[in-house]
């Protein structure tokens, strides 16, 4: 718990814990939910084989991953997956991203791959010539009126989190405490936010 408190003071988008044990995963899910929903920190975590049914959890579900130099456990390889997602520009998706270092992993047929994606799993698969990532989904499976299918997509959640963080940071750094809380000044902030959203739309 002390380590998690220290981690939470840093600014980051994706977290992995390569030494995590199975009995710690539920605690991590609760921790991520708490910060995303109550503490204004839109973090995500890559966890090995854990169906968190939550947009803030990436369920990396391979059983083993082999490179030329080492065979990795799923937990160990979550760092690679977190880095891959975090390093993917928001203009593209991590879907089918190649992993050139992988020479073997657990394999499934196309129907099984589709089922895994529908179960909220993100995994490495072999297309017959190379190893690459599956469709880039998070672990959210149960959709609701407030969280529909878009929330299942890693890229869409990343974009929503970026917008949330940008607007919150702008309000804190440039408006709150800098201007009187009048109607006109609120309109200035709304205008700035609207301009930001239009700029994103143009991109």
List where the protein language model places each region.
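Extracellular Cys-Trp
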Residues: 1-97
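Structured, hydrophobic secondary-structure cores that serve as assembly/anchoring elements
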Residues: 85-203
């Amino acid at each position: 718990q002390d380590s998690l408190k220290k981690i939470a003071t840093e600014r980051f988008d994706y977290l992995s814990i390569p030494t995590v044990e199975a009995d710690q995963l539920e605690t991590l899910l609760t921790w991520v939910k708490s910060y995303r929903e109550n503490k204004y920190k839109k973090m995500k975590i890559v966890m090995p084989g854990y169906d968190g049914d939550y947009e803030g959890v990436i369920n990396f579900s391979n059983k083993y991953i082999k490179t030329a130099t080492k065979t990795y456990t799923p937990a160990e390889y979550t760092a690679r997956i977190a880095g891959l997602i975090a390093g993917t520009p928001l203009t593209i998706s991590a879907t089918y991203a190649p992993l050139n270092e992988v020479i073997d992993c657990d394999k499934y047929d196309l129907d099984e791959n589709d089922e895994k994606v529908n179960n909220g799993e993100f995994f490495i698969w072999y297309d017959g010539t190379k190893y690459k990532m599956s469709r880039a989904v998070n672990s959210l499976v149960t959709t609701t009126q407030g969280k529909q299918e878009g929330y299942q997509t890693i890229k869409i959640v990343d974009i929503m989190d970026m917008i949330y963080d940008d607007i919150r940071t702008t309000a804190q750094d440039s408006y709150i405490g800098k201007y009187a809380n009048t109607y006109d000044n609120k309109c200035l902030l709304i205008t700035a936010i609207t301009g930001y959203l239009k700029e994103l739309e143009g991109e």
